[in-house]
Amino acid sequence: MNESDKIIQRSQLPLLGAYVEPRSPTEKKLAEVWRRALGMDRIGITDSYEDLGGDSLLAASIIAELETSFGTKMPWALLADAGTIEQMAATIDNLKEGAK
């Protein structure tokens, strides 16, 4: 809520840091999934899941969607351990590489 007791939507909140656009296919897919789950217009690869309002319920749905999208089992602690799209993409790329 703001000072006038009006509810503020997440998408109206100021960006927490400088926006860094997704570069790799993995980062782009993660940004797409995070945007849908968090109801935001734009998420950069250095934005923190927790700072954006992510919680454990959203994390469960994000992990399930990522497992389907990438065809790889994802650890449930992935979001907590990585925290950003950039870090998460590196972990997922390593998981996919290790599965080959």
Predicted regions and their residues:
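Phosphopantetheine-dependent thiolation modules in NRPS/PKS and related acyl-activating systems
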Residues: 1-100
